[in-house]
């Protein structure tokens, strides 16, 4: 499928929001991803937008620091945007989508730009009228890299069933975020996770440790945890 690039905007020094418009109706579930075809290969990116807004696909591309790969991606997409060139994307992929038939409380844990996945899950849950508790934990290097922090604060204020806990490794604003590792904060705040549906997105190591800790130490069953990274662990 071909998409036009409608907008590219910086969210931090190294993270960008890319808005794509498919040239035909595009169906996906909250929590799925697409592969974007580039001159040097195809790369996966989680869809940050909600399926109810299927006219556009929002991607978050980048990281807490500069990297050669992300620089190449953004250079190519920016050039395509400037020239009006279309980009080719795959159909929606991944099996860690939101299980909207469940009434269990949700625990959403994101690391870095894993928030793109988490944001789609969260927004779709609310759009469907979920009223069970939803806990959102987001870990990043510092406050700058909590790049949709204000939006999440507003969502939590507007929805009584949503709790948002930001966590930064470097503490510059202790009044706004906990300091430490996001998984350690989850472990500190919950003694039992046996009744939760748990959605994870972030570095592979984070997801692997989360599975081990939540299952071995907090009573979660493997089938309660959802992450596309599990296919590679």
Swiss-Prot record:
Keywords: FAD, Flavoprotein, Luminescence, Oxidoreductase. PROSITE patterns: FAD_FR. The keyword Oxidoreductase applies. It comes from the Bacteria. Transmembrane segments: none annotated. Its EC number is 1.-.-.-. Residues 1-133 form the FAD-binding FR-type domain. Signal peptide: none annotated. It holds the Pfam family NAD_binding_1. InterPro entries: FAD-bd_FR_type (IPR017927), FNR_nucleotide-bd (IPR039261), MRET (IPR050415), OxRdtase_FAD/NAD-bd (IPR001433), Riboflavin_synthase-like_b-brl (IPR017938). GO terms for biological process: bioluminescence. NCBIfam families: PRK08051.1. Probable flavin reductase in the luminescent systems of different marine bacteria. Belongs to the Fre/LuxG FAD/NAD(P) flavoprotein oxidoreductase family. This is Probable flavin reductase. It comes from Vibrio harveyi. The gene is luxG.
